[in-house]
């Protein structure tokens, strides 16, 4: 059967690459104990050897602090082997069992409890679906109380590849276990802040324990971006490691060469904090603020005032040299109009303290991109007008090329990967951590998201200003929260609600980003863009994802009204049309809800049925004990 699932070159044909068991050894720590097929061709299934690219696999599959929980689930990403291919998606279920309960206790088991993790390495980002199947298998594997019984794991590999062989990334099964409703109920208006943070390609760290809450929240935020889960993560774990950044930083010497990538920009090095120049402009402003409609959107540290003189040492900065496109500094050519906030008066009506949340300041500006693409046949390098994302895009250019060119998505980051936070080839990241050491390294990131408390800590006042919600933003967020809370009981009862449901929320964010993109293409669009935040849009236009999108044509956007929902009279009409439309297709929404809600049950039922059949056949074959076994 294995031969049927593999091509002549030995490469697996199905979406599942490997089934791996990771255990904790009292002397060696976390290590791979079993892999099928072997992680390295030619090795045995019990080999501990790891490919260099996957050296962190044991620490991801069996996370830090696992001993504090009886069982948990982890989502993680691995880079492709040999630099070829796409991200490998890992789903791991770990459990622990008392050593005295084991039927067969191996000699190296010296502790009172045994921790092991069963994980699937897949080519498809089917997080929830694989989790549902894997939880049952892990439970059955532990129920054997004999970890040498690996036949069930080999059969799991074959079963998953046969059942998922024709799996599509376009259906609702991609979003299983990712609930925007729960996210909105928990973060409320701050969901839009998280959305904008990632649009700006900032360094964002999510923090909470246990791991399943962490990865669930992080991946749910990403599911708000159209097409991101399905097609936007294929390059999210690739980077070219170089030396870590020192305090003095020699960034000019460490910039990636143009030929390091298919497409390269002169300004792709992290642009998270702009050092002393921005601080001089900023001056001193009040920091703590409250909003009438909501608790403070950002957690502001009291010590930030005293940190101003030391900012040059605390924050990572991009190269100070000017771009090759201009002999002047980007700051010298900055349009003074971007220093003004046209929405300040309007926001004062919502809350008198809100406009003082961030000091007025300018926005980073970067050089225009230079695209390098090898020419077919000749192999010569030529300049071409458009940047290539390398992603499978729809007619609107979705998903945006956020997680490309060294901007990483790490749903769970092991402590052993800490160096990535200061690697100069990592433009930014959206990462999750459970170890408090990550949270303490605030100078290495732009924002820390405390999931448990629904807090967003941003220590850079200029970034807080960029993310300061406009009146239109607050209306949009309130529109979401109101519909989710009003329909909470109905959706919970039958799981099929449309308005306020998971698919409905994703539809609202799709309209939001489509309208924002359409607005950037309009002439005389200052008033429209002010609804999203003039300074925010200016900063966003300098990100890699926007430059890639803007360098290509998307005719379908001509049909999009460039007004965000709830931001004006026309915007309100759009919102009303969406509500009417959603009511008209409520039956379709219920069908979608039923398919999503039932997919978990369906997956578990199918796996239980297969597991029952496998267990029965195994029991029959073991009616008589083998020779030599008591």
Swiss-Prot record:
Domain uDENN: 17-161
Region of interest (Disordered), residue spans: 299-372
Membrane topology: Single-pass membrane protein
InterPro entries per UniProt: ABL9/DENND6_dom, DENND11/AVL9_GEFs, Tripartite_DENN
Biased composition (Polar residues): 306-315
GO CC, any one term: membrane
Sequence positions bearing Omega-N-methylarginine: 570
UniProt keyword Membrane, yes or no: yes
One GO BP annotation of this record: cell migration
TM stretches of this protein: 214-230
Localisation per UniProt entry: Recycling endosome; Membrane
Annotated keywords: Endosome, Membrane, Methylation, Phosphoprotein, Transmembrane, Transmembrane helix
Record family assignment: Belongs to the AVL9 family.
Purpose: Functions in cell migration.
Protein name: Late secretory pathway protein AVL9 homolog
Species name: Pongo abelii (Sumatran orangutan)
Organism ancestry: Eukaryota, Metazoa, Chordata, Craniata, Vertebrata
């Amino acid at each position: 059967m294995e031969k049927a699932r593999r091509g002549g070159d030995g490469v697996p044909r199905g979406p599942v690459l490997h089934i791996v068991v990771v255990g904790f050894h009292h002397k060696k720590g976390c290590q791979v104990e079993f892999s099928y097929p072997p992680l390295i061709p030619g090795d045995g299934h019990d080999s501990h050897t790891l490919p260099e690219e996957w050296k962190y696999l044991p620490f991801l599959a069996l996370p830090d602090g696992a001993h504090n929980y009886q069982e948990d689930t982890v989502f993680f990403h691995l880079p492709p082997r040999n630099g070829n291919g796409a991200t490998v998606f890992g789903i791991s279920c770990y459990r622990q069992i008392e050593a005295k309960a084991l039927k067969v206790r191996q000699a190296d088991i010296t502790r009172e409890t045994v921790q092991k993790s069963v994980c699937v390495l897949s080519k498809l980002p089917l997080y929830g679906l694989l989790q549902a199947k894997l939880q049952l298998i892990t439970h059955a594997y532990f129920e054997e109380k004999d970890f040498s019984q690996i036949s069930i794991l080999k059969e799991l590999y074959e079963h998953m590849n046969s059942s998922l062989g024709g799996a599509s990334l376009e259906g609702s099964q991609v979003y299983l276990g990712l609930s925007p409703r729960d996210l909105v109920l928990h973060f409320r208006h701050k969901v839009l802040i998280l959305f904008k943070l990632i649009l700006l390609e900032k360094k964002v760290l999510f923090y909470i324990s246990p791991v399943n809450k962490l990865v669930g929240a992080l991946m749910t935020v990403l599911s708000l971006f159209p097409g991101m889960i399905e097609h936007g993560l294929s390059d999210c774990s690739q980077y070219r490691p170089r030396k870590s950044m020192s305090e003095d930083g020699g960034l000019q010497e460490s910039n990636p060469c143009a030929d390091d990538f298919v497409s390269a920009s002169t300004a792709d090095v992290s642009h998270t904090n702009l050092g002393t120049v921005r601080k001089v402009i900023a001056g001193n402003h009040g920091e703590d603020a409250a909003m009438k409609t909501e608790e403070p959107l950002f957690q502001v540290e009291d010590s930030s005032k005293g940190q101003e003189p030391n900012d040059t040492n605390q924050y990572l900065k991009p190269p100070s040299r000017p771009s090759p496109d201009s002999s002047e500094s980007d700051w010298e050519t900055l349009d003074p109009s971007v220093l003004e906030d046209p929405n300040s008066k309007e926001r004062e009506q919502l809350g008198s303290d809100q406009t003082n949340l961030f000091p007025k300041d300018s926005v980073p500006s970067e050089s225009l991109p230079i695209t390098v693409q090898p020419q077919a046949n000749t192999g010569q390098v030529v300049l071409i007008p458009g940047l290539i994302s390398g992603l499978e895009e729809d007619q609107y250019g979705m998903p945006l090329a956020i997680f490309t060119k060294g901007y990483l998505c790490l749903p769970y980051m092991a402590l052993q990967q800490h160096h990535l936070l200061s690697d100069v080839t990592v433009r930014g990241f959206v990462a999750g951590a459970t170890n408090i050491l990550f949270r303490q390294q605030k100078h290495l990131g732009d924002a820390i998201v405390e999931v448990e408390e629904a807090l967003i800590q941003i220590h850079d006042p200029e970034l807080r200003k960029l993310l300061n919600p406009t009146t239109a933003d607050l209306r949009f967020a309130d529109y979401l929260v109101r519909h989710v809370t009003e329909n909470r009981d109905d959706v919970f009862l039958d799981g099929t609600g449309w308005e306020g449901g998971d698919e409905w929320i994703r539809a609202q964010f799709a309209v939001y980003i489509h309208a924002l993109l359409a607005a950037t293409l309009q002439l005389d669009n200052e008033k429209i863009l002010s609804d999203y935040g003039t300074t925010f849009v200016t900063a966003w236009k300098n990100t890699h994802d926007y430059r890639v999108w803007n360098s290509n044509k998307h005719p379908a956007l001509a049909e999009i009204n460039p007004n965000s929902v709830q931001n004006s009279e026309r915007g309100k009409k759009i919102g009303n049309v969406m509500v009417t439309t959603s009511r008209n297709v409520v039956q379709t929404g219920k069908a979608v809800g039923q398919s999503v809600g039932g997919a978990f049950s369906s997956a578990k039922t199918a796996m239980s049925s297969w597991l029952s059949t496998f267990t029965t056949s195994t029991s029959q074959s073991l009616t008589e004990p083998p020779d030599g076994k008591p």
